[in-house]
């Protein structure tokens, strides 16, 4: 495994992967766009409050490591960023649409159950059933160039095991257990969060459209 991202780098890459699929008309993203995406209060765990300077430092580091590239074509007054983390022309990591959706959701929200992942990743890929989610996770866990995810030990009193990505190195399961949010209705919460995320995306699109009309 050659990926050793910090938590903030994982957030930046996760945001770019997400916006590439969910709001392609706004992609690539400017620094301000990345800041807004990183600090979203929906579909993010933990919620962050990064400054523009902090995000710029992460972007510069990721460009140097060839995980991102800058885009500044004709008529672009602002430098924008696009991901080269996966499925890029010269990159080694190739993922299916289902794999991208799960990896992105894990980068943005940490350890989750297959049920939570199916609900939360639905804006990026519509999984036909739980079997597809689980088989995709198993592929990511058993790839020869990986593994990219790991199945965690099932916690006492929980019906499902959670999965975590390995792009930030090995997983400290004890730390994850102590920081895991308690929820008696995880599936309902996931659906509410998915709806909140859709509303946030629509608001972002509307703001972008209004800003464009005002130019």
Swiss-Prot record:
Q: Which family does it belong to?
A: Belongs to the UPF0502 family.
**Pfam families listed in its UniProt record:** DUF480
Q: Which domain of life is it from?
A: Bacteria
| InterPro entries xrefs | DUF480, WH-like_DNA-bd_sf, WH_DNA-bd_sf
**Which species does this protein come from?**
Salmonella newport (strain SL254)
Q: What is this protein called?
A: UPF0502 protein YceH
